[in-house]
């Protein structure tokens, strides 16, 4: 098992992944494991420090989440965040109670001990993000207050001699202005970690692992046109001789305008052989008459398996199947369930369908989405392909409200292409996290020239986000939106109205279906 400098024990917080991402961004390799991880497995990773995440439970509840008691005897530095702070307080003899006033949102942190290494070069007063219903009432012996807020007299505590620290706030959330700095201080000055983690070193390590795993056997790699599968293919191409890699691209007719051609051009540029299967007709037949979003997903998934299985059957000498499983998928498949979100086993995690006998190759299962993009650039993939906005697995099918047909896809593709052109020309494409159009199953009356029209409505959706878990609608200048609307209505026959979605997530989701 590889050495992990910082290990995060997950107690169910919606923010847990952010802890690992913030530390990795600063060059410190970090992994997330369930809070119930055994002390043997923790020791096997040889961590230099442990972080206890937040979570939805109460430490004084009968069924409270508790880590393996052995972690307290390792002598390692520990940082507790929110629920993690309450665990530390309780374990060392302090007391925790339900707070009179729940504290949610921004608060001002005042540092009481500027000499504490956790606060090295951190501003004495800064904004932090609180999200808790319980609080420490009495500190354990040996602990001191190192930070306070208006409603939290124990906002940050420390036992400097034991190298144990605890925050009532969430340093990992971007609203905590100095939070990343505090996490880096914990890793660097308290745990002694070095900033050696980067995509260059990861790529070399992973390429060596692929060569050792695959040997001289063949690998089948399904390519969707998305960033993840393209990066997987590029990494396999770097690791293996050309004759050992079989890349298959199923064109299901649900991609954005010219996207299938762009995928094929990219693989030519990278000199990676690509088998393209034109399955548009089969997918359209499978979607005929289907209007329910979940039924669309099911129909697309079943048809993809059928088409891919048929192609896989032609390659009887293949031993491995490559998948674009991400670290997010791995974490969520074993994560603690909490009220913040429903965690389910991801489609890329947990094995293969019964009909497949391949061994899996998953070169991305240790990294996050933003790291995948950095890895793609490291491997030489074109920036315009790596920087594309997220695109759903079922493709345009879930951006057509109602039945999917060729005419609906035409309207959607053309409107989406115009919107993207306008965003790029005005410099807003890279300023939003995701932007797309949705074809609504709504028609309305309009007037074009002297004629009455009764045509389709398109919704423009643009959001700002860090990771897609939460999102706010993008505040795009009206003249940019007006330009998008004018071009869509004037250039696409069949659309006479454009609306802008100003919903945030939550309560809405980013995609409409």
UniProtKB/Swiss-Prot annotation:
What Gene Ontology cellular component terms go with this record? cytosol
Q: Which PROSITE patterns match?
A: GATASE_TYPE_1, GMPS_ATP_PPASE
Which CDD domains is this protein grouped with? GATase1_GMP_Synthase, GMP_synthase_C
List ligand-binding residues for ATP.
224-230
The UniProt GO MF terms for this protein read: ATP binding; GMP synthase activity
Which catalytic residues are annotated? 82 (nucleophile), 170, 172
Write the Enzyme Commission number(s) for this entry.
Answer: 6.3.5.2
Span of domain Glutamine amidotransferase type-1: 5-196
Q: Give the record's keywords alphabetically.
A: ATP-binding, Glutamine amidotransferase, GMP biosynthesis, Ligase, Nucleotide-binding, Purine biosynthesis
Q: Which residues form the GMPS ATP-PPase domain?
A: 197-388
Q: Which domain of life is it from?
A: Bacteria
Q: What class of enzyme is it?
A: ligase
Statement: the UniProt record of this protein carries the keyword Ligase:
yes
Give the matching HAMAP family.
GMP_synthase (MF_00344)
The record describes its quaternary structure and partners as: Homodimer.
Q: Which NCBIfam families match?
A: guaA_Cterm, guaA_Nterm, PRK00074.1
Write the protein's name: GMP synthase [glutamine-hydrolyzing]
Source species of the chain: Sulfurovum sp. (strain NBC37-1)
Q: What is the lineage of its organism?
A: Bacteria, Pseudomonadati, Campylobacterota, Epsilonproteobacteria, Campylobacterales
């Amino acid at each position: 098992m590889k050495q992990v400098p910082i290990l995060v024990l997950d107690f169910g917080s919606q923010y847990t992944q952010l802890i690992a991402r913030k530390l990795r961004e600063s060059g410190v390799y970090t992994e997330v494991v369930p809070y119930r991880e055994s002390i043997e497995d923790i020791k096997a990773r040889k961590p230099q420090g442990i972080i206890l995440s937040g979570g939805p439970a109460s430490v004084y509840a009968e069924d409270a989440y508790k880590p393996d008691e052995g972690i307290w005897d390792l002598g390692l530095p520990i940082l507790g965040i929110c629920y993690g702070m309450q665990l530390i307080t309780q374990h060392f003899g302090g007391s925790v109670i339900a707070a009179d006033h729940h504290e949610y949102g921004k608060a001002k942190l005042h540092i009481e001990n500027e000499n504490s290494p956790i606060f090295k070069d951190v501003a004495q007063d800064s904004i932090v993000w609180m999200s808790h219903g319980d609080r420490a009432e009495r500190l354990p012996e040996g602990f001191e207050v190192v930070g306070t807020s208006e409603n939290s007299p124990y906002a940050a505590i420390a036992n400097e001699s034991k190298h144990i620290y605890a925050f009532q706030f969430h340093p990992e959330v971007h609203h905590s202005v100095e939070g990343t700095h505090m996490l880096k201080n914990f890793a660097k000055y308290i745990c002694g970690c070095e900033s050696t983690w980067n995509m260059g070193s990861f790529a070399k390590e992973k390429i060596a692992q692929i060569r050792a795993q695959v040997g001289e056997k063949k690998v089948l790699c399904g390519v969707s046109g998305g960033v993840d599968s393209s990066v997987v293919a590029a990494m396999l191409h770097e690791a293996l001789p050309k004759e050992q890699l079989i890349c298959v691209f199923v064109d299901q007719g649900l991609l954005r305008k010219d996207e299938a051609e762009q995928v094929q051009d990219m693989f030519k540029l990278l000199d990676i052989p690509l088998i393209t299967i034109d399955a548009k007709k089969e997918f359209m037949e499978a979607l005929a008459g289907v209007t329910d979003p979940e039924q669309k997903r099911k129909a697309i998934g079943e048809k993809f398996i059928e088409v891919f299985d048929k192609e896989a059957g032609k390659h009887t000498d293949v031993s491995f199947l490559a998948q674009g499983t991400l670290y997010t998928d791995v974490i969520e498949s074993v994560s603690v369930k909490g009220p913040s979100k429903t965690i389910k086993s991801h489609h890329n995690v947990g094995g293969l369908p019964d009909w497949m006998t391949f061994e899996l190759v998953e070169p991305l299962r240790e990294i996050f989405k933003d790291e995948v993009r950095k890895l793609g650039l490291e491997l030489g993939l074109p920036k315009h392909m790596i920087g594309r906005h997220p695109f759903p697995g079922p493709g345009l099918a879930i951006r057509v409200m109602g039945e999917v047909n060729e005419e609906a896809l035409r309207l959607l593709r053309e409107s989406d292409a115009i919107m993207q052109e306008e965003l790029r020309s005005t410099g807003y494409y890279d300023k939003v996290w995701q932007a797309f159009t949705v074809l609504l199953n709504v028609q309305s009356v309009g007037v074009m020239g002297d004629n009455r029209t009764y045509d389709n409505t398109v919704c423009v959706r643009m959001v700002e986000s860090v990771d897609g878990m939460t999102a706010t609608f993008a505040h795009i200048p009206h003249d940019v939106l007006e330009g998008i609307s004018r071009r869509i209505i004037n250039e696409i026959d069949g659309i006479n109205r454009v609306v802008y979605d100003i919903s945030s997530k939550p309560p809405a989701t980013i995609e409409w279906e």
